[in-house]
């Protein structure tokens, strides 16, 4: 296999010259005649606001706001809150409302390159309507929908934007005003409410944006339905053969983001309105163009190209730089997993983002750093030293796992996962100042935890007892392979960090790491835990010692473990990450057929129509599973691409193999130097 590395920034845009197969357009996912009975929404997001599509025209199913949690109908722990729908629009022609049943030629399309969701339809013989909405990438709390109406006959339209306070919010107040001066008139439809316990205030504000000047724009009417609902609307007569365009702009923000969300929501809406549609779209597209400087291009497998780009799109959509936000397993695609942060971030989503966009990965690890004190408190109340990160984390950093799940008290490997991510960030970026200020406190505190967590046995070995494994079907077991492996790496990396910074680390860290128990069964296979015999497992565990931990490097051992545990994964009710690890390891073993088989098995059985969104399990109906996307992207980048985080710092390329039907794999914008890697047969 030939491998080429370019040190300059290289960006290649693969264009599809024909739309003969929508399913294989490298940048667009399309749905003709969306069927509400077989429809799983697509998400448009900017790392702060997520908008989930609806099969109904001019509607969205749900809006998700990152960073705001409260207790609501999901046990006694916090969760994302059902929020205001900013894009709740009604359109009528000559008094007849647009509905799914009275339109023709209905199509929806996600433009991944530009972060835009578009719907189009014909309303009887009167007009063709196209609408596109955006979670504006440069304005994290703002969205926009642009509507274009092309008339075939004279018609009069009525457009209404409805703000309804969801039942999850309390003590709502509704406001309407016109901001008027000599050159503009900006109508503001605003609602303010509190989360269920009153912990946070949420504010939303909408306005219409017209191409006409102040004197020609339609009159805006305000209507109060009841205490929970109000709307603004306008009428407009349009001549046959004309195109009429308008936009709806909205802002959504909470007291978790800023002290005064009510005023700031209105300020942001006014700002966006006066920026104007063209400037907003230009800035939005510039931001997406910048994101796509880091891309994956596949030649020879059009469907794989589209699917991989969809995975990139979703991870880019669910994250953003210069924040302390970190994605949940479902990203911003809904309320799944309560919006909590798990190990899914550090082990599955963080590595591809670290290589593609270190500045975004920095936000993910910043999330953990800001909650380090909470992790110290958890360690203390469980009788340990240092810092013990929660299995499920939200805004405070306290444990948020429902009490009926044993993972909250016993799945301790997440602490090592956080430390590993911190060290990887330093290796890729070489940011020594960050390492001193934030990386070292994380690595030191987590190493102190493991030093107090291990138990020395009669043989002088160190054991870690009574945990829930990465294979979560194994509860309250001793010496879980992956948990012990993360402890080893955590202690080793903390010692290395101390050396880099010229700090003296406790000698016991290295001594303990060298003697933590990793055992084998009589057949030579790495044993998942002390009481493991031959049970089925929920997900990869012992195999993770080969990657990402790289504690097992012998190829025969890696293959032995693969061939054993790949037979222990049931075909249903197991999460999508496992097969991605199998694919990655087979790529590095240069077994092309097995690598490609597990690559496809990692996500294709999990796809849902019409946009091929990924669910957590095979046949599942809970997309979008961004954890699975992160795993598959690692199979492509670190597996087929052979990219690897060098223990000495930076990114290197190890021996790997492409699928036989892939002619070429190009990975652009890697690391802080934005390198390009090209692989061919």
Curated annotation (Swiss-Prot):
Annotated binding of beta-D-glucose 1, by residue: 74, 391-392, 407, 472, 538
Pfam families: Glyco_hydro_65m, Glyco_hydro_65N
pH-activity relationship: Optimum pH is 5.5.
Catalytic residues (UniProt): 472 (proton donor), 616 (proton acceptor)
EC numbers on record: 3.2.1.216
Compartments, as annotated in UniProt: Periplasm
One GO term of the biological process aspect: carbohydrate metabolic process
Cited function: Glycosidase that specifically hydrolyzes kojibiose to beta-glucose and glucose. Also hydrolyzes, with lower catalytic efficiency, longer kojioligosaccharides (from kojitriose to kojipentaose) and shorter oligosaccharides produced by the degradation of dextran-containing alpha-1,2 branches. Probably acts on alpha-(1->2)-glucosyl isomaltooligosaccharides. Shows weak activity with nigerose but has no activity toward p-nitrophenyl alpha-glucopyranoside, which is a general substrate of exo-acting alpha-glucoside hydrolases. Has a strict specificity for alpha-1,2-glucosidic linkages.
Entry-linked PANTHER family: GLYCOSYL HYDROLASE-RELATED, PROTEIN-GLUCOSYLGALACTOSYLHYDROXYLYSINE GLUCOSIDASE
Record note on quaternary structure: Homohexamer; dimer of trimers.
Protein name: Kojibiose hydrolase
Organism: Flavobacterium johnsoniae (strain ATCC 17061 / DSM 2064 / JCM 8514 / BCRC 14874 / CCUG 350202 / NBRC 14942 / NCIMB 11054 / UW101)
Lineage, uppermost ranks: Bacteria, Pseudomonadati, Bacteroidota, Flavobacteriia, Flavobacteriales
